[in-house]
Amino acid sequence: IGGGGHGLATAYYLAKEHKITNVAILEKGWIGGGNVGRNTTILRSNYMLDANGLFYEEGMKLWENLSQELNYNVMYSPRGIINLAHSDVQLNTYARRGNSMRLNGIDAVMLGKEGVKKMIPFADFSETARFPIFGALMQPRGGTARHDAVAWGYARQIDSMGVDIIQ
């Protein structure tokens, strides 16, 4: 298994849930040096399609206790995520997505222009703004985490469980 986020998580859950530890992480570089250390750090489950939303929502639930589970601070911060709508069409699309999310039990809040202005007062709300703001879709539980910290947390745990790491 490779030493990126997916590989490390796979090795961890194989060891934790199924007691399978005769697994080797083979990483051509270094743990946390690939995409897992360079991505956007955004955590969300704000997807339109049922299967996608529910899949990512399951991941959101894992993030909530991951620092405690790994005994490693992954710097999870559920500060919310706001997707700005820059046209009436985009606002309607976000309303549709938000409705789909709520039907699946996923948190979603539509914000009008004034609601966005209260939350992001420094944004350009002028008539001449390059990207005018019509409103937004907010997922209050969305947030960020340090994905490279997640890689190191998984690596430390699987090493202690007997999984071999070769880098």
Residue ranges and their predicted role:
Residues G32, I120-A129:
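FAD-binding beta-loop-beta segment adjacent to the flavin cofactor pocket
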Residues E27, G112-K113, Q167:
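Short loop/edge segments at beta-strand edges and connector loops
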Residues A15-N39:
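Glycine-rich FAD pyrophosphate-binding loop
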Residues T40-F122:
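Dinucleotide-binding Rossmann-like beta1-alpha1 core, especially the glycine-rich loop
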Residues L137-Q167:
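Helical element adjacent to the flavin cofactor pocket in flavoenzyme catalytic cores
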Residues I1-H6, A24:
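Beta1/beta-strand and adjacent pyrophosphate-binding region of the FAD-binding site
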Residues A11, A15-K16, Q157:
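Gly/Ala-rich phosphate-binding loop of Rossmann-like dinucleotide-binding domains
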